[in-house]
Amino acid sequence: NDGIADSLVPSMLTIDVTAANDAPTAIDTTVSASEDIPYVFTPEDFGFSDVDATDVLEGITVTTLSEIGTLSLNDTTVTAGQTISHDDIFNGGLIFTPLANDNGVGYDSFTFTVNDGDVDSANQATLTIDVAAANDAPTAIDTTVSASEDTPYVFTPSDFGFSDIDENDVLEGITVTRLSSVGTLALNETTVTAGQTISHDDIFNGGLTFTPLADDNGVFYDSFNFTVNDGIADSLVPSMLTIDVT
């Protein structure tokens, strides 16, 4: 309109809208690790969403650290506020190490933001780490028993020193790694051989006996070595059972 008349033919005004990058969103995730084994993160472990369909995860920033285990990048402890690239994660550089012999659901966690190559997420998310329990080998402990001259000694399970960091594990058997050298060690009246495994039940039922020589006695009279078993693993180091004969 020129102030008096409108144009006879309408025209079109086209509006171009230039795209702007939208910040991504970090999403809470949980990973499953195993006791005594460092967990190696992958990019997929970090929850990422972006309304810009072509944007992908380019990196993260660790905003708060794990409290129990250790988060490290290429063998160096990660610090709060540290930015870690997608490639560093993809190449296996980001690792979480739980405490030795420790485990649990919701064992540890840290928070992070994600980056799409241009901008960080406005929110931070939590990555929770579950650590599955693994069996730990038990420990055999040196012990001494007191037998009587000319009387076979009948062993009980409590004669064999046993310790296990897994508090629910108990003695399930022993292996005789070195034989007695003076008297005779027998299982159900058959002489025991080096390397023989003997179950808890055989010991509990009175099957394992030691017979000293006739009319013989002494402090530290004889001994043999053994390992203990928790039903899964043997102790790594044998211990000694000493027999005093009075």
Regions from the language model: what does each represent?
Residues 59:
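Catalytic-core segments of thiol-dependent peptidases
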Residues 173:
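Conserved, well-structured core segments
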Residues 1-21, 33-40, 45-56, 66-134, ...:
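Acidic, turn/loop-rich segments in luminal/extracellular domains of secretory-pathway
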Residues 22-29, 136-143:
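Proline-enriched interdomain boundary motifs that mark the N-terminal boundary
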